[in-house]
Amino acid sequence: MESSTHVSVGISQLFQCSYLEDQQEQLLIIQEPFLDPLLFERLLQLGFRRSGDAIYKPRCPSCSACIALRVPVRSFQPSKRQKRTLAKNKDLTVNWVNESSDEHYALYEKYINLRHFDGPMFPASREQYEHFVLCDWAPPGFVELRLEGKLLAVAVTDVLPTSLSAIYSFFDPDFDARSLGSQLILTQMALAADMDKAFVYLGYQIDANRKMCYKRLYRPYQILTQNGWEFHTNANL
């Protein structure tokens, strides 16, 4: 961050971790009502993430399981499995839209209630969806995947000066065989290349949580360490 740039940072109370049952979670939270895109992207480079209007970063007293991960767009090479995913989804139409819709929420509700009924986001509600996904000072884009007009999947995506940030993805569980979660990331990578972006930020890799350990499959990738961003080419951190 430039030496002339200052932001206020608060710290949350300890609370039960949403991802690891035996851990307590604590967050650094940016205390600014508005962030311009350049500052927001710089905070991403420092390991922060967006949830709704909030910008946060884990600062847990006894755990460092959350590892910020990004994929360099120009270096990315899909694996054989990812190529098969692309092949079986070549009949899908990709749309980029700038507004959320009732159709998006209906799909989100179905996804949460069927796939994450054992998690903290269940049961889904419109208020929860809007608070989590939307942002007043940086409206996201929405990557849609459609099959003959039917909405199958959505990736909520922030567009920054030199990167895309994957905020959240949801899809129709009735089409599990299509690997739509993976397809959405591959689509974001392709869109980032078309936009001449340098990175796609995928969020936090958490090896100990089976639902949060997929990000390292998109290679090569970089993880944020105490020494800066570190390059990896294998599936293990």
Curated annotation (Swiss-Prot):
<dbReference type="InterPro" id="IPR030700">
    <property type="entry name" value="N-end_Aminoacyl_Trfase"/>
</dbReference>
<keyword id="KW-0808">Transferase</keyword>
<protein>
    <recommendedName>
        <fullName>Aspartate/glutamate leucyltransferase</fullName>
        <ecNumber>2.3.2.29</ecNumber>
    </recommendedName>
</protein>
<comment type="function">
    <text>Functions in the N-end rule pathway of protein degradation where it conjugates Leu from its aminoacyl-tRNA to the N-termini of proteins containing an N-terminal aspartate or glutamate.</text>
</comment>
<dbReference type="InterPro" id="IPR007472">
    <property type="entry name" value="N-end_Aminoacyl_Trfase_C"/>
</dbReference>
<dbReference type="InterPro" id="IPR016181">
    <property type="entry name" value="Acyl_CoA_acyltransferase"/>
</dbReference>
<comment type="similarity">
    <text>Belongs to the R-transferase family. Bpt subfamily.</text>
</comment>
<dbReference type="InterPro" id="IPR017138">
    <property type="entry name" value="Asp_Glu_LeuTrfase"/>
</dbReference>
<keyword id="KW-0963">Cytoplasm</keyword>
<keyword id="KW-0012">Acyltransferase</keyword>
<dbReference type="Pfam" id="PF04377">
    <property type="entry name" value="ATE_C"/>
</dbReference>
<dbReference type="GO" id="GO:0008914">
    <property type="term" value="F:leucyl-tRNA--protein transferase activity"/>
</dbReference>
<dbReference type="Pfam" id="PF04376">
    <property type="entry name" value="ATE_N"/>
</dbReference>
<dbReference type="GO" id="GO:0005737">
    <property type="term" value="C:cytoplasm"/>
</dbReference>
<dbReference type="InterPro" id="IPR007471">
    <property type="entry name" value="N-end_Aminoacyl_Trfase_N"/>
</dbReference>
<dbReference type="GO" id="GO:0004057">
    <property type="term" value="F:arginyl-tRNA--protein transferase activity"/>
</dbReference>
<dbReference type="GO" id="GO:0071596">
    <property type="term" value="P:ubiquitin-dependent protein catabolic process via the N-end rule pathway"/>
</dbReference>
